[in-house]
Amino acid sequence: RATVDRALRLIEQGALDQAGIEALAERLGIGGRHLTRLFRRYLDTTPLAAARTARIQRAKRLIDSTDLGMTEIALASGFGSVRSFNAAFQQVYRRPPTAIRRRAAG
């Protein structure tokens, strides 16, 4: 479980935003398949899904606490494009990020 906790900390710091699972696993001293198995065993998810969740949470915090534009938030949160940011955000919150910001402001 300690390896999964370390992996989660690295993911929250953006470890999978630029590199893949193999690079993260190497930093942890294990193989990528083993890392994925550990995530499934302890968290019932995958490292990529955990990274996506971390990016969405990071974006939500930025929406709530800054006046940054959505493009800046998408990139600062680790998304490769505004389109992927909008799609992921809408899937989780069932509304686009701009609607969340309007709701928070109103």
Where are the model-predicted features located?
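DNA-binding recognition helix and immediately preceding turn/loop
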Residues: 2-56, 60-86
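…primarily DNA-binding HTH/wHTH and HhH modules…
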Residues: 87-106
